[in-house]
């Protein structure tokens, strides 16, 4: 089959690399417009991105960190979300009891430390400014880490690797027309200098969504009202933690790369328009980059006929928990493992397409609910019905593993649990009650000791030591 990827950016080039590696018998064409620049100033990932980079045979992880100026990401620090001066840490790795039916160590940690930065190995690393890397047999070994990326450098690196692949053809051109048959199947794309036919088209055109119409869009603005982003940069700070600061008109992310902080203020127009003034008053060294509007939501179908929309071409959710790159990778993995086959007929089977769309829709609903829950202390934002039920369950008896969607790529109980407790939806007395009911006190004390031993006995590199050896 001939698979045409339309659009560059991180989603386009990582798609080209993964598809061509895992589906080597197909032909791949990537069409990248020379007129479109990279939007982001900095972006965080989940641990899945590191796993993918490790899997690709022509990418050396240490080289990737060095060339892209990426830094480890061990979690997100949320400031002022449940009130001015409040703070909590949501780690990448989760607690030692994350996979148990009841995450007892999380509740125990909250009774001791409501900031939750002692619930996990990554939390202990944060407190000591250590990285989640060691040197073993002369090579870097990571302990379940994610990354902070410089978007432009990452795109350049992924593109350079893709151009060396024999089964990827790169065309620099701009699409201005799409030709479909009578039932809506795309037959060819017409560019300024090329006419390109294909069997499957992968839409990685981001907000432009050139294969879709406005009628295909499902809005989430009732529960996710943020609709504007102003990006800016700040001076470099040595850090391995994303910061998410709640402000008057929304919230601000700060992502540390090796050379700067990539930042963005996500705001709601209905709450006010003095965004730049608020940025300057909170971050005196801010250098404004650009602003753009958005609407949270998704397409009705990620896979429609022979077009598969990935990343921002399929959805937009404010970048509160690195869901964009994460979902793109989940989509690609599902397509490679369970959907794309040796022939066009087998691949475009209606039941295969339906299976894929249902799974991706469930994930987006999970992500929507999860991002919405962060605003549960802000009366201006309407909670989803699901989140009202989850908060009620939490207060009555805590959350169990099966209370949250357990599907490949979903947020999972680890992220939900830290967020709900970090937002102070429970008291310490509540947590003591739940631990007593679960007979968990002996277990959590033992787990606490084992966690401290692990942290003490492994020679984790400091931030400076890691950067110096790259």
Give the label of every model feature segment:
Residues 1-9:
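Beta1/beta-strand and adjacent pyrophosphate-binding region of the FAD-binding site
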Residues 20-41:
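Glycine-rich FAD pyrophosphate-binding loop
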Residues 37-131:
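Dinucleotide-binding Rossmann-like beta1-alpha1 core, especially the glycine-rich loop
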Residues 72, 341-470:
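Long, low-complexity C-terminal extensions of enzymes
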Residues 247-295, 315-326:
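Conserved FAD/dinucleotide-binding core of flavoprotein oxidoreductases
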Residues 303-320:
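Short FAD-binding loop at a beta-strand-to-alpha-helix junction that anchors the flavin cofactor
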Residues 324-342, 356:
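An active-site-proximal "capping" alpha-helix that borders the catalytic cofactor pocket
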